[in-house]
């Protein structure tokens, strides 16, 4: 049976189809007007690639589909979510329990749709506020009171009053969500922000997910599990997924794929960069695991919770190059997949980063996306000449180099800042490059950054889909507490641990998974503030709460944190499903002499340089720059003084030439 892993990005939608022995990488254009079109396009292309007469015939051999995306990320970034109303404690309408005005006010929620309620609101207070919100056209109402966790009785009472007046079956009723249930944490502002982001993005994500589920069932007669990628690096069924938990799930899976490869290679610290059509993402792997942060900004929204550290720069293959103040700039505007770069020949007339790479000779115009799209060099050159070279007063070739160098500078700056935030230096880390355009910049960025080795992957263009392919079903449950680790803590903490375990087991059973076969990771957060936290953990099989507490007690003692306040408890349940990891490459293919093509790597004139075909290179083969490796899944320029070696897993290792 096959597994299918699909990753919907802003420009391209990627898929990885695997039976555990062979893998097939697929890319189609993302369709932002309806994400299920590109979702279905991946399945149709897979059926065609594998020789099945129809998508339905192919899906009959598929045991599982996992889908990660940037759908919620795009909804937040483009500010096109649902109209949401907030009921908060009076006096916090602007700051939402922070010290200054919350950045979501006026962005994710109109200030007129934030209603302050008195400490003990009457039914008249509540319904008057709701009437004002409904007249403002809100589609969801979030109730987020101060100090509503762990005791959320006041929020529940408000919800009961609203639902009594506006029951589900009447016209005009809207969902009422409680911040204490959406984000059961002690930090008031975090509860508001999580609740708001979830309500804001829910409709757009749910529309795509349920439409995909209907398409699979009704059009293709497939009833297997459709699992949705979450930002914790796991997957879950649609009914167990909150919209806010899918933010950046696609890029996060790339980081988890990188962590898998770091452990495979025995690398301790790695900085990853994922270059797509619109953005570049940077992340860190520490000790073989993705680096998480406690507190910070999630999509520019401050929260005090744990999430994968991911940083972005608005530069990608579709980024538009312009001249401002006699210098080249890139982005933030992007041509996307349609009309795309000028070289696509689909009507785009702006010069983009992809056009520059083609003009410099790095791309094979006849083998783009595995030959499924022919690139037009003349259109790329004309766009660069018109939009960059003439305004700068330089040759077309110098203009193309300037575009490339600006991209390298932006990517390097992003990686330097990310390394500094992680308290690492470039000399401490290896560099992983993936995404559709990552390998294109691996050596250039490695040289400028100062790392000793860089890696580009055979599955690099679909690397987030690879991260999904090694993922398991994961659920994370969190409860904020305010306790001291003393003689009475056992009686106080046991009910919380028991409630978390019960919820995890119930959710696994609801997804037809056996809780006894799952792994459970328990964590306790200690600290004097929400921003300065020490975490202890214990990993167990399914156990009674008392056994869990005994294991955590040992961990607390070993960590020496018993004197600090206990701020929260967290449980991650993990159920292993059909994961397909990386295997050493065993096959050998007939050697092929490299071709040649005119390329430009620096200010010198163009010169004919070797072009190695990736599909004809074997383990141990070395290509020395200046050269380029072109293939259906990997294109990697090798500048002078650098070399590329095919490693044991069929990936590319870049290093300075001896």
Curated annotation (Swiss-Prot):
Its EC number is 6.4.1.8. Induction: By ethylbenzene, toluene and acetophenone. The keyword Nucleotide-binding applies. Divalent metal cations. Magnesium or manganese are required for activity. It is an enzyme of class 6 (ligase). It catalyses: acetophenone + hydrogencarbonate + 2 ATP + H2O = 3-oxo-3-phenylpropanoate + 2 ADP + 2 phosphate + 2 H(+). GO terms for biological process: glutathione metabolic process. Keywords: ATP-binding, Cytoplasm, Ligase, Nucleotide-binding. The keyword Cytoplasm applies. Disulfide bonds: none annotated. It is found in: Cytoplasm. Its cofactor is Mg(2+); Mn(2+). Acetophenone carboxylase consists of five subunits; a heterooctameric subcomplex of two alpha (Apc1), two beta (Apc2), two gamma (Apc3) and two delta (Apc4) subunits assembles with the epsilon (Apc5) subunit in an unknown stoichiometry. PANTHER family: 5-OXOPROLINASE RELATED, HYPOTHETICAL 5-OXOPROLINASE (EUROFUNG)-RELATED. Catalyzes the carboxylation of acetophenone to form 3-oxo-3-phenylpropanoate (benzoylacetate) in the anaerobic catabolism of ethylbenzene. Also carboxylates propiophenone at the same rate and 4-acetyl-pyridine at lower rates. Belongs to the oxoprolinase family. This is Acetophenone carboxylase alpha subunit. The gene is apc1.
């Amino acid at each position: 049976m096959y597994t299918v892993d699909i990753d919907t990005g802003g420009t391209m939608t990627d898929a990885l189809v695997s039976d555990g022995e062979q893998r097939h990488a697929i890319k189609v254009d993302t369709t932002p007007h309806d994400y299920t079109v590109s979702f279905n396009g991946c399945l149709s292309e897979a059926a065609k690639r594998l020789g099945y007469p129809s998508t339905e015939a192919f899906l009959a051999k598929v045991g599982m589909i996992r889908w990660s995306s940037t759908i919620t990320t795009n909804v937040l970034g483009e500010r096109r979510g649902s109209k949401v109303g907030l009921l908060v404690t009076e006096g916090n309408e602007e700051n939402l329990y922070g010290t200054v005005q919350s950045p979501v006010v006026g962005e994710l929620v109109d200030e007129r749709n934030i209603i302050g309620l008195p400490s003990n609101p009457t039914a008249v207070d509540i319904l008057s506020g709701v009437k004002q919100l409904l007249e403002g056209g809100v589609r969801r109402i979030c109730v987020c009171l101060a100090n509503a966790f762990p005791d959320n009785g006041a929020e529940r009472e408000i919800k009961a009053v609203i639902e009594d007046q506006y029951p589900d079956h009447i016209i005009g009723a809207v969902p009422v969500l409680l911040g204490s249930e959406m984000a059961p944490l002690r930090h008031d502002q975090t509860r508001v922000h999580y609740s708001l982001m979830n309500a804001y993005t829910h409709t757009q994500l749910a529309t795509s997910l349920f439409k995909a589920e209907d398409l699979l069932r009704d059009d293709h007669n497939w009833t297997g599990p459709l699992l949705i990628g979450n930002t914790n690096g796991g997957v879950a069924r649609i009914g167990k997924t909150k919209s806010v938990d899918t933010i950046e799930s696609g890029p996060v899976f790339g980081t988890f794929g990188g962590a898998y490869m770091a452990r495979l290679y025995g690398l301790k610290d790695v900085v990853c960069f994922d270059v797509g059509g619109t953005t570049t993402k940077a992340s860190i792997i520490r000790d073989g695991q993705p680096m998480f942060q406690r507190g910070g900004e999630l999509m520019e929204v401050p929260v005090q919770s744990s999430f994968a550290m991911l940083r972005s720069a608005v530069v990608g293959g579709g980024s538009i190059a312009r001249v401002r103040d006699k210098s080249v700039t890139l982005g933030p505007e992007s041509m996307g997949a349609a009309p795309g770069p000028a070289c696509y020949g689909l009507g785009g007339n702006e010069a983009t980063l992809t056009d520059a790479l083609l003009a410099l000779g790095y791309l094979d115009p006849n083998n783009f996306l595995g030959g499924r799209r022919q690139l037009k060099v003349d259109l790329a050159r004309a766009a660069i000449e018109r939009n960059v070279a003439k305004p700068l007063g330089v040759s077309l070739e110098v203009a193309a180099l300037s575009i490339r160098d600006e991209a390298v500078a932006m990517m390097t700056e992003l990686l330097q800042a990310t390394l500094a935030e992680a308290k690492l230096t470039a000399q401490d880390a290896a560099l992983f490059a993936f995404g559709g355009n990552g390998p294109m910049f691996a050596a250039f960025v490695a040289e400028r950054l100062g790392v000793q080795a860089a890696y580009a992957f055979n599955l690099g263009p679909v690397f987030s889909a690879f991260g999904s392919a090694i993922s398991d079903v994961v659920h994370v449950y969190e409860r904020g507490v305010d306790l001291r680790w003393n003689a009475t803590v056992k009686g106080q903490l046991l009910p919380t641990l028991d409630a978390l375990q019960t919820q995890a087991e119930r959710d696994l059973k609801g997804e037809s998974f056996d809780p006894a076969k799952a792994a459970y990771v328990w964590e306790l957060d200690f600290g004097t503030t929400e921003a300065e936290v020490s975490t202890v953990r214990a990993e167990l099989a399914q156990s009674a709460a008392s056994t869990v507490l005994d294991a955590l007690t040992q961990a607390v003692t070993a960590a020496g944190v018993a004197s600090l306040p206990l701020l929260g408890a967290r449980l991650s349940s993990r159920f292993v499903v059909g994961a397909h990891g990386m295997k050493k490459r065993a096959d050998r293919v007939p050697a092929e002499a490299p071709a040649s093509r005119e390329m430009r790597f620096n200010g010198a004139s163009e010169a004919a340089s070797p072009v190695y075909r990736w599909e004809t290179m074997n383990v141990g083969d070395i290509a020395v720059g200046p050269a380029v490796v072109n293939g259906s899944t990997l294109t990697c320029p090798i500048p002078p003084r650098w070399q590329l070696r095919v490693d044991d897993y069929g990936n590319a290792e870049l290093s300075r030439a001896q």
